[in-house]
């Protein structure tokens, strides 16, 4: 019993001793606080604590300061060591033989950096190199993006090897791990399914051509195959095959469905009715541009697919165009026709021609004759004394009037008095003339933009242009008729805004009065005032296009030498003629742009109101209704509204109202 107790006590003691002997030692912890410590001393301290051999590059210099309030285990202490060196621009290279090498970060990428793998990726700030193969993304396209996320100025580096489509990434293990995550998400195979899109109306080949053309910008961006949708035409079934990334594929399918629509017209011929333009005028324009359109379309097609000629005809009765063309050319022509078939603005051109003529003349002469000594004769008197004496002798002889005297008297104007006694004769002629001529014309005309318009009010005057006497003493005269009156020819061009360029030809002509003209057997004399010019004026503005202020003084004296110069008595031996004429001529013009029906109606109503007011003042209100049949002009009824009065006031400013 005693022996058994002793054995039991001895066994318990052995168990306690064994437990104490084989108890694991407590993990060693390190302090991580350094202040102003030389970096090499810091490296030596860590090397000693971790029991690692460290080789320090001679370029490693400096001091460090770091503070930690926690105790770190061996692994934490090593990562702390790597992080501190990283902050100060140094890196640690693990030589895989228990030796560590401390170098500058920029030199680490060319050192013997260990190649990491999925099994040994590295931890924290360890410098590692990783080889990453890519399957769906081009390495040359992804490398620039990854470089922006890596520390390229320090230990980081990202390069690509295009033949194998791999990335070579060097850097801190934590950074490389983040870059790997990005690569895995980007290098996605995607969905490469093929979708067949049947077509009901369009041609598969034409649709593929259009889609490919529209998709050129996407292709030029050099995206990988998974990001770009591909389209192929199946002409056998008239369908389009689409493959690619789902989003791109859906975008292409939606585009194809928009193109596959029924045409508005059947066949290639269409009748287009015009609203404003003249069909015959558009045919020449459209024929010219359609040949260019067809050349551009056919240049992109194979020879077997060339279109037929484009045919454009005009139907005058309905003012319509009949167009035969391919659908694509037809659409282009319709757009051009829509832009040409617009309501063109018009221009109301109003002109004022104001002319005042005033002429005064005085002819006075005395002629003497002596039967034996001779005579003084002045032809500017209109009646030579020799003709008068010969006629008087003829009359005294047989009581008849000679033809020469009759002709002279018929063409003479004024007074002629004298005596014929014995051998002496005297003839006094006198003529005073006064001519006044006032012209006020206010022509107006409306025309389309860029269309020439002519306004002509006058009469045709016969003019002798030739005379011929035949063998039978018959006289044949050739007569032409010359139009005299008021002519206005204008071509307006509306520029940007409301300015109008006017090409003007204006003429005011009349037949000169017999008393003031030099007419003879050659025919009448015409007074002509013409203006040909171009002016730029704003709509509604008045501009002077021409003017003339003319004064003419003519003083003629025919006299007997010496005797005609004697004061007072000399008047008996001379003939004088004096004429003073004045002429004032001004031409004004005012264009008004008319863009719509309301403006046209307003302008027409204003003209009618001004005309009616002028006639009322001239003939009296009681006769006005009898002169103008209101039933015929009910489209322009007289109204005393503000709108009509506003137009009338504008025209009154142009001197139309009451001065016709």
From Swiss-Prot:
Keywords: Cell outer membrane, Membrane, Protein transport, Signal, Transmembrane, Transmembrane beta strand, Transport. Belongs to the bacterial secretin family. GSP D subfamily. The record marks 458 as: May serve as a pivot that allows opening of the central gate for substrate egress. Residues 126-190 are annotated as: N1. This is Secretin PulD. Residues 598-660 are annotated as: S domain. The gene is pulD. One of its GO terms (molecular function) is identical protein binding. Residues 28-124 are annotated as: N0. The lineage of its organism: Bacteria, Pseudomonadati, Pseudomonadota, Gammaproteobacteria, Enterobacterales. It is found in: Cell outer membrane.
């Amino acid at each position: 019993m005693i022996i058994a107790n002793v054995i039991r006590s001895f066994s318990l003691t052995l168990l306690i001793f064994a437990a104490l002997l084989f108890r694991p030692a407590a993990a060693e912890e390190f302090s991580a606080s350094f202040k102003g410590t030389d970096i090499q001393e810091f490296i030596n301290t860590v090397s000693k604590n971790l029991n690692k051999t460290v080789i320090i590059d001679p370029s490693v210099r400096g001091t460090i300061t770091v503070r930690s309030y926690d105790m770190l285990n061996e692994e934490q202490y090593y990562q702390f060591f790597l992080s501190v060196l990283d902050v100060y621009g140094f890196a640690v290279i693990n030589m895989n033989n228990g030796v560590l090498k401390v170098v500058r970060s920029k030199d680490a990428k060319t050192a013997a950096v260990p190649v990491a793998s999925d099994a040994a990726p590295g931890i924290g700030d360890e410098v590692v190199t990783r080889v990453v193969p890519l399957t769906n993304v081009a390495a040359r396209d992804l490398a620039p993006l990854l470089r922006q996320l890596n520390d390229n100025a320090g230990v980081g580096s990202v390069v690509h090897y295009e033949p194998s489509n791999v990335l070579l990434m060097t850097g801190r293990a934590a950074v490389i791990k983040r870059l790997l995550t990005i690569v895995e998400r980007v290098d996605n195979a995607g969905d490469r399914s093929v979708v067949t899109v049947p077509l009901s109306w369009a041609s598969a080949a034409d649709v593929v051509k259009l889609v490919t053309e529209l998709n050129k910008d996407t292709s030029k961006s050099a995206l990988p195959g998974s990001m770009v949708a591909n389209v192929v035409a199946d002409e056998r079934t008239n369908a389009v095959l689409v493959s690619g990334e789902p989003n791109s594929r859906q975008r292409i399918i939606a585009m194809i469905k928009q193109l596959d629509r029924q045409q508005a017209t059947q066949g290639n011929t269409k009748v287009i009715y015009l609203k404003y333009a003249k069909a015959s005028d558009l045919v020449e324009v459209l024929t010219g541009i359609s040949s260019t359109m067809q050349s551009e379309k056919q240049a992109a097609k194979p020879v077997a697919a060339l279109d037929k000629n484009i045919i454009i005809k005009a139907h005058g009765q309905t003012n319509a165009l009949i167009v035969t063309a391919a659908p694509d050319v037809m659409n282009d022509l319709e757009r051009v026709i829509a832009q040409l078939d617009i309501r063109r603005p018009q221009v109301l051109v109003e002109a004022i021609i104001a002319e005042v003529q005033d002429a005064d003349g005085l002819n006075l002469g005395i002629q003497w004759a002596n039967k034996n000594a001779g005579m003084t004769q002045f032809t500017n008197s209109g009646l030579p004394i020799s003709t008068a004496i010969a006629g008087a002798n003829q009359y005294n002889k047989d009581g008849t009037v000679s033809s020469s005297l009759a002709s002279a008297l018929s063409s003479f104007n004024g007074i002629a008095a004298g005596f014929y006694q014995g051998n002496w004769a005297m003839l006094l002629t006198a003529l005073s003339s006064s001519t006044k001529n006032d012209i006020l014309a206010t022509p107006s005309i409306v025309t389309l933009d860029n269309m020439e318009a002519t306004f002509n009010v006058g009469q045709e005057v016969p003019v002798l242009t030739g005379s011929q006497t035949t063998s039978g003493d018959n006289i044949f005269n050739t007569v032409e008729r010359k139009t005299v009156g008021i002519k206005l020819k204008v071509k307006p061009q509306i520029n940007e805004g409301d300015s109008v360029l006017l090409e003007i030809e204006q003429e005011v002509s009349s037949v000169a009065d017999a008393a003031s003209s030099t007419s003879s057997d050659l025919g009448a004399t015409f007074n002509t005032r013409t203006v040909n010019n171009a002016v730029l004026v704003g709509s509604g503005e008045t501009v002077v296009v021409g003017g003339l202020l003319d004064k003419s003084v003519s003083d003629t004296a025919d006299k007997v030498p010496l005797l005609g110069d004697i004061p007072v008595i000399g008047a008996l031996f001379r003939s004088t003629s004096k004429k003073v004429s004045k002429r004032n001529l001004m031409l004004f013009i005012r264009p008004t742009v008319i863009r719509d029906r309301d403006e046209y109606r307003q302008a027409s109503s204003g003209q009618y109101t001004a005309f009616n007011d002028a006639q009322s003042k001239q003939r009296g209100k009681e006769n006005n209704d009898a002169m103008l049949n209101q039933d015929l002009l009910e489209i322009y009824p007289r109204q005393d509204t503000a709108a009509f009065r506003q137009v009338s006031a504008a025209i009154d400013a142009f001197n139309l109202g009451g001065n016709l």
